[in-house]
Amino acid sequence: MSVDTYTETTKIDKLLKKPTSHFQLSTTQLYNKILDNNEGVLTELGAVNASTGKYTGRSPKDKFFVSEPSYRDNIDWGEINQPIDEETFLKLYHKVLDYLDKKDELYVFKGYAGSDKDTMLKLTVINELAWHNLFAKNMFIRPESKEEATKIKPNFTIVSAPHFKADPEVDGTKSETFVIISFKHKVILIGGTEYAGEMKKGIFSVMNYLLPMQDIMSMHCSANVGEKGDVALFFGLSGTGKTTLSADPHRKLIGDDEHGWNKNGVFNIEGGCYAKAINLSKEKEPQIFDAIKYGAILENTVVAEDGSVDFEDNRYTENTRAAYPINHIDNIVVPSKAAHPNTIIFLTADAFGVIPPISKLNKDQAMYHFLSGFTSKLAGTERGVTEPEPSFSTCFGAPFFPLHPTVYADLLGELIDLHDVDVYLVNTGWTGGKYGVGRRISLHYTRQMVNQAISGKLKNAEYTKDSTFGLSIPVEIEDVPKTILNPINAWSDKEKYKAQAEDLIQRFEKNFEKFGEKVEHIAEKGSFNK
């Protein structure tokens, strides 16, 4: 054991043994601490609402992986996976541990990530804030008892000090905020941000390194299972309908965001859900609304003096959130795992109005679209966006995947082949013209298409190959107008459709160039018109 490792272990032990380090508090005890410390307010729904301050989302430019000899050759370094040297990390780590040692109170949670016993990650989470500790308790997998928690010897430790601000010139960071992952020291170090989602996504990034090393696929997707045991996975970026479409009263939820896929099937990495809360209503999303009760956390929502919550008010952020244990939802699988998937749905919101509402993909096309991770940024969603812009996020979650994208794509291709999985590309965006001209595809029609795909009714249906993209489109789907199935038919100006489609194809091709020679085999067989 090196001197540094010995020192940090001693400091961690010292923090854990402090009389004012509260270990494995109950939800009620954490509520009392949150309210006593003025960290949040109680809402009429029973949930507490907390503010994350100026950081209302993740800080991807402030996230680093420590460049360590045993790990550095595996990481796909670049703008997303940024390196920081070990010496710089250790200096900052010790500063944070010394800072936390001076705090009057700390909060400690022990639990797990990964509902598969063979690959379960044992966790210790050390928090400066009580509401962050409740977040960890809600989002990670909880031990059955406090006694079980005391026996957990962690594989990874999260050290979260949101009120510690880094000095970039001294500490080697880019700003006051930092999220640093060290595989050698088995630590996620977080400071300078109160956005609790950094803890959840930090562990997800760790699992996205560790699982593929054991030939286990890790995925940014939601998952559910039908009455007959049929499993469906939903991949998609923000605004594509992933949460809405996977919340189905006739199917049980496995998980809403992070999963692994091993030799036994699919398993949830988490023990909770982190749902978007903007414009939430009981009518539109009853499962999520009903889950926001005692024990849940709301982030950055607007709460009136009487405790009522205005979910439509975005004065603090569009990214309001609700974090709650998965057992706040009635319709779940216990434990959170199931058999191999029968169906995979890739969701995209095409604001150009040219991608078919649903198409069946072969394995090569599936790998191509998985690597592309396409959706659209719409006018108004970001400053300066006045026209729809294509947005590509590798593996439908580029910020969370440390290895080269082909590692995940190749694993996916092998699993699709091995288990004969049906893969569909579903466009929840526009039809009959681009955003501003055409109209959004009806949610009713999208649900019908997804339900038909998941039920297996489209497996052996009749398909036609569209001349523009080379995608296989169902000739007909029950209760869905034929006119929208092939997008060119919904456009009054066919030449405009062809020009818009060709423009999008070129953008896909340009995006794919970033992967280099490693993906030539996928581009050759899986791209449009192939």
Curated annotation (Swiss-Prot):
Cofactor: Mn(2+)
Alphabetic keyword roster: ATP-binding, Cytoplasm, Decarboxylase, Gluconeogenesis, Lyase, Manganese, Metal-binding, Nucleotide-binding
A single GO cellular-component term on record: cytosol
Main location: cytoplasm
Residues annotated to bind substrate: R58, Y195, K201, R321
Catalysed reactions listed for this entry: oxaloacetate + ATP = phosphoenolpyruvate + ADP + CO2
Protein location: Cytoplasm
Enzyme Commission no: 4.1.1.49
InterPro entries given in the database record: PEP_carboxykinase_ATP, PEP_carboxykinase_C, PEP_carboxykinase_N, PEPCK_ATP_CS
Binding positions for Mn(2+) per the UniProt entry: K201, H220, D257
GO biological process terms, semicolon-separated: gluconeogenesis
GO molecular function: ATP binding; metal ion binding; phosphoenolpyruvate carboxykinase (ATP) activity
SUPFAM superfamilies: PEP carboxykinase N-terminal domain, PEP carboxykinase-like
Binding residues annotated for ATP, in chain numbering: 201, 220, 236-244, 285, 321, 440-441, 446
Keyword GTP-binding: no
Keyword Cell wall biogenesis/degradation attached: no
Pfam families: PEPCK_ATP
Bound cofactor: record note: Binds 1 Mn(2+) ion per subunit.
Pathway per the UniProt entry: Carbohydrate biosynthesis; gluconeogenesis
Physiological role: Involved in the gluconeogenesis. Catalyzes the conversion of oxaloacetate (OAA) to phosphoenolpyruvate (PEP) through direct phosphoryl transfer between the nucleoside triphosphate and OAA.
Name recorded for this polypeptide: Phosphoenolpyruvate carboxykinase (ATP)
Organism name: Staphylococcus aureus (strain NCTC 8325 / PS 47)
Gene name tied to this protein: pckA
